[in-house]
């Protein structure tokens, strides 16, 4: 079985398809082959194995021995899916999922074990029925002259003109609430475009590196990530707060 160019790990029938930019390996289309393929993919390409070993003692080699015992030639697709999903959940990573035509596995402990800190019904009350919407953002002005913008996803792009329009409409307000709780994630550039409206100077926001080989420590040299202000666009100059929770991807 070949590794294919997908970000997520997908189980289709008994064939596991997964990402690769390092090598092209062949695995038997069998429970054993699929198990080996998935374990090797994580071992070579997952970024946080050493970090998670330090944080809570994750030993990926021990995980191999533990879950290898649960693999048998006669198991069906549902049984195989369950074992592979359980193995991935050992990573405790809400971004690592396993999917098939009939099932979808996700590490839900990441958010289910903590307060939701978000209520759709309450949000509908303070958004009301007359809220405005632009580029996927819902926005409203509260009675105390505080503006509110909800961004439920960064999957679709946010137009620069749309941001100008929204911020111009809200310019009369004394403050702004940016709500990204339960944001399903999406494009980093979309989030950066929004954040650029809240700074007047270049800001260092972090560092980024990527995997360069199969070793757990094979990473490129960290590269600084800078947030550039949108100097030729409308920028927010008053107080602002951000609401987030553990379901903000």
Residue ranges with predicted function:
Residues 185, 228-236:
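Active-site microenvironments of hydrolase-like enzyme catalytic domains
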Residues 15, 170-172, 234:
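Alpha-helix termination/capping residues and helix-transition junctions
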Residues 1-28:
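Bacterial Sec-dependent N-terminal signal peptides
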